[in-house]
């Protein structure tokens, strides 16, 4: 009986659902044994979106959502195991990212906050949980993000071939794997799907722009594009990370206020170009050519992929499927891997990426007993 399974739980800034993966690490290449996506109920999603912005009675809302999200994460694990026909006794630990509700690493007392009570997950599943992966890195002077570049390096690096792994979730982040002994570079480029999702939700009450079809029907307004790309984040040096605290619907409405004459589809096209141009600028600053593999929800946006391809003529553009891991499961597997690293007493961060003063074992253990 295999007892070397780890589970990864991930809910990103898009908050489009909880990804749960069961991974076998008994061989050098991880094997994805089972996968499950759990929808976040609408009332919980509304409260999470509310909590991501400053408001009243935040502590009460935070406490209740911490438990609610923990229960959802626990249910996702139980559903995953039922699907796979695997008993809880075969799982070493769950690596839970949690749901980020605030990420502000650049304050004098920088912090990041993920909810989804790991004690609740442990009790609901009967499996030890490793969680709170980001705050050790922040305690060491780092950004606490992105953390997945260490996993990207382990799984996707290729000698003598520069590669970029680009994750496009709510926020987009890239990992530059130089193919040499040089340091891996990784950082958040800026908005991924967060602005295009916010705009289509506001105008059409749709969760996302499928295939980027609405953006494709519009024409980018160069003046608005230039205005949005003038945000100071885009010119900051790395290491850097961001989130919905900077790029959200309120910011979008404020920035677009003087552009009310624009067609709604033209605004969507412009927002998609904010994502594509910010990614392309940072990519070209690292290397003019190479291989670029996309993961995350953005990999399924055909208009986004097409525009990126045009902006990066020196790159061979594809998805992480070509490297053996489907785009939607990369981050979940990464947190299963981080749980395994914690279990083995191994570091999980890359100081060159996060800015931390040293490598460290990430996460805390929450026993099921």
From Swiss-Prot:
Keywords assigned by UniProt, alphabetized: ATP-binding, Carbohydrate metabolism, Kinase, Nucleotide-binding, Transferase
SUPFAM superfamilies (alphabetical): Actin-like ATPase domain
Enzyme Commission number(s) of this protein: 2.7.1.170
Family annotation (InterPro entries): Anhydro_N_Ac-Mur_kinase, ATPase_NBD
Root EC class: transferase
GO terms under biological process: 1,6-anhydro-N-acetyl-beta-muramic acid catabolic process; amino sugar metabolic process; peptidoglycan turnover
Positions contributing to ATP binding: 12-19
Matches recorded under Pfam families: AnmK
Pathways involved: Amino-sugar metabolism; 1,6-anhydro-N-acetylmuramate degradation; Cell wall biogenesis; peptidoglycan recycling
GO molecular function: ATP binding; kinase activity; phosphotransferase activity, alcohol group as acceptor
Reaction catalyzed: 1,6-anhydro-N-acetyl-beta-muramate + ATP + H2O = N-acetyl-D-muramate 6-phosphate + ADP + H(+)
Matching Gene3D superfamilies: 3.30.420.40
Task of the protein: Catalyzes the specific phosphorylation of 1,6-anhydro-N-acetylmuramic acid (anhMurNAc) with the simultaneous cleavage of the 1,6-anhydro ring, generating MurNAc-6-P. Is required for the utilization of anhMurNAc either imported from the medium or derived from its own cell wall murein, and thus plays a role in cell wall recycling.
Similarity field: Belongs to the anhydro-N-acetylmuramic acid kinase family.
Protein name per its UniProtKB record: Anhydro-N-acetylmuramic acid kinase
Designated gene of the protein: anmK
